[in-house]
């Protein structure tokens, strides 16, 4: 018994020294910079103390070699990897692929040993050149969407060869080994067509399971984006469309629980109801809900856009069977996640001994704290606390952007922030939040810690005080 207590004590001590047993892996998207006004997000807006790993999405591929995609990726890479100067424990990875990237470049690249070698060599050079700690393979999906059946095995071959090359390079360079991870499917048919789970799991450091987009307007009826459990009336393959089933499918088919990372969406899916009075789960729909003013994509709202909808008079419902909320207003219906559902899922994750949480994406959280009245990064912070991620020795940013110098009534046009502190003093005695600008309906004041920032709505929109949001006039 004394031995057992000693071993337990050592384990607890070791865990205290190493930090949390769980990982919090946060994606950043390089197109978030193009969102208007308060939605614009760059690496400098990331709080480096929240996540254990940050993943930059996405890189591309040309002639079987990894490449940049955006005109300013190299500049953003530096800002992204400089976050490690403020958190010495932070690891950064670069993701390649994504849904819009398709499958063809991956299929060509894995098809021959020479092509794979070309790719792996380019990846090592690229990651070391720009200061990343690993590569995240986001092939959606091997063996599906035009990818031939043999790609299931060739994906395993690629990952095995990459892991071996990374190990060899670490020895030769006397540097820590580069990590190799993958974002993988949550749909059972895509999993079966795409992954040799036991073999693949040997070589991947983490397996990021995309346990979201499980329902959407493509089905013709309402459904939750990322339900923890099935809805009671779901049968057949529909009963597989939940986080619990998907994660256990990966585990039961040969992936170690500690390598499996549960996907958490910081966004929701919107629908148009055919009949506004039929507004529960499974209600008939006629298509995507309207695009949000910042993310500008039909059927999709960032968490901060969701808060605007909720504050505009939507009815919120907690779906106890699936442990997630939904909301509706007139003919608009929303399936989403909130602080409560993130907390419930985090406890479930720990009870099942999974390796941690992955979020898509940190730029979709209420990163300014202006929309939800829950502080900055409320969803990501919920997971950080629930998983016991240590922030010791980490320096968080003070404010998300520079204060504005324009005094009220000067009618400044253009961007969403700029200049230095001083100027208006509008926020000196105001609570944190958003306020209208007296003579400019397109503009609004953002108050943070008594400091004044002037922001602008997207062209054509006006600041609406009924929802504290940018809206159509």
UniProtKB/Swiss-Prot annotation:
Keyword Transport on entry: no
Compartments reported by the entry: Secreted; Cytoplasm; Cytoplasmic granule
Ranges annotated as biased composition (Gly residues): 410-421
Tissue-wise expression: Detected in macrophages and lung epithelial cells. Detected in the acinar cells of parotid gland and von Ebner's gland but not in submandibular and sublingual glands. Detected in gastric chief cells. Also present in parotid glandular saliva and gastric juice (at protein level). Highly expressed in submandibular gland and stomach. Highly expressed in parotid gland but not in submandibular and sublingual glands. In tongue, expressed only in von Ebner's gland. Expressed at lower levels in lung.
InterPro entries: Chitin-bd_dom, Chitin-bd_dom_sf, Chitinase_II/V-like_cat, Chitinase_insertion_sf, Glyco_hydro18_cat, Glyco_hydro_18_chit_AS, Glycoside_hydrolase_SF, Glycosyl_Hydrlase_18
Binding site for chitin: 70-71, 97-100, 141, 210-213, 360
Domain GH18, first and last residues per copy: 22-390
Keywords: Apoptosis, Carbohydrate metabolism, Chitin degradation, Chitin-binding, Cytoplasm, Disulfide bond, Glycosidase, Hydrolase, Immunity, Inflammatory response, Polysaccharide degradation, Secreted, Signal
Domain (Chitin-binding type-2) ranges: 424-473
Active site (UniProt): 140 (proton donor)
PANTHER family in the record: ACIDIC MAMMALIAN CHITINASE (PTHR11177:SF188), CHITINASE (PTHR11177)
Its job: Degrades chitin and chitotriose. May participate in the defense against nematodes, fungi and other pathogens. Plays a role in T-helper cell type 2 (Th2) immune response. Contributes to the response to IL-13 and inflammation in response to IL-13. Stimulates chemokine production by pulmonary epithelial cells. Protects lung epithelial cells against apoptosis and promotes phosphorylation of AKT1. Its function in the inflammatory response and in protecting cells against apoptosis is inhibited by allosamidin, suggesting that the function of this protein depends on carbohydrate binding.
Name of the protein: Acidic mammalian chitinase
Organism listed in the record: Mus musculus
Top-level taxonomy: Eukaryota, Metazoa, Chordata, Craniata, Vertebrata
Gene: Chia
């Amino acid at each position: 018994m004394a031995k057992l207590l000693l071993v337990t004590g050592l384990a607890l001590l070791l865990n205290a020294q190493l930090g949390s047993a769980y990982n919090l892996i946060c994606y950043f998207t390089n197109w978030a910079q193009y969102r208007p006004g308060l939605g614009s997000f760059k690496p400098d807006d990331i709080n480096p103390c929240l996540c254990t790993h940050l993943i930059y999405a996405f890189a591309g591929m040309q002639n079987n070699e990894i490449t940049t995609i955006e005109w300013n990726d190299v500049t953003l890479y530096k800002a992204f990897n400089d976050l490690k100067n403020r958190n010495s424990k932070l690891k950064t990875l670069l993701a390649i692929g994504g849904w819009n990237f398709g499958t063809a470049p991956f299929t060509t690249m894995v098809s021959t040993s020479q092509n794979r070698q070309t790719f792996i060599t380019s990846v090592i050079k690229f990651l070391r050149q720009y200061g990343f700690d690993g590569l995240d393979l986001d092939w959606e999906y091997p063996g599906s969407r035009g990818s031939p059946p043999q790609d299931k095995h060739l994906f395993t071959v690629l990952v095995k060869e990459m892991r071996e090359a990374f190990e060899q390079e670490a020895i030769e360079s006397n540097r820590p080994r580069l990590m190799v991870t993958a974002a993988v499917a949550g749909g059972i048919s895509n999993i079966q067509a795409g992954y040799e789970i036991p073999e693949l799991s040997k070589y991947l450091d983490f397996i990021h399971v995309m346990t979201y987009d499980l329902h959407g307007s493509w089905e013709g009826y309402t459904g939750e984006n990322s339900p923890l459990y099935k809805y009671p009336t779901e049968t057949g393959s529909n009963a597989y469309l939940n986080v619990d089933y998907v994660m256990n499918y990966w585990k039961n088919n040969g992936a170690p629980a500690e390598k499996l990372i549960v996907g958490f969406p910081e966004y929701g899916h919107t629908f148009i109801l055919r009949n506004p009075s039929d507004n529960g789960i499974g209600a008939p729909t006629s298509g995507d809900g309207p695009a949000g003013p910042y993310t500008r994509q039909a059927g999709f709202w960032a968490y901060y856009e969701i808060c605007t909808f909720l504050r505009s008079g939507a009815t919120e419902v907690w779906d106890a069977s699936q442990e997630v909320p939904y909301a509706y207003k007139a003919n608009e219906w929303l399936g989403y996640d909130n602080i409560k559902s993130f907390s419930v899922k985090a406890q479930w994750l720990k009870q099942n001994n999974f390796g941690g949480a992955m979020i898509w994406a940190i730029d979709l959280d209420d990163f300014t704290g202006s929309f939800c009245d829950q502080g900055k990064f409320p969803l990501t912070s919920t997971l950080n606390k629930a998983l016991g991620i240590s922030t010791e020795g980490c320096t968080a940013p003070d404010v998300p952007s520079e204060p504005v110098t324009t005094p009220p009534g000067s009618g400044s046009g253009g961007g969403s922030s700029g200049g230095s502190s001083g100027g208006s003093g509008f926020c000196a005695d105001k609570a944190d939040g958003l306020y209208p600008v007296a003579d400019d309906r397109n503009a609004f004041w953002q108050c943070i810690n008594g400091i004044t920032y002037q922001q602008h709505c997207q062209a054509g929109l006006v600041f609406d005080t009924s929802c504290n949001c940018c809206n159509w006039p």
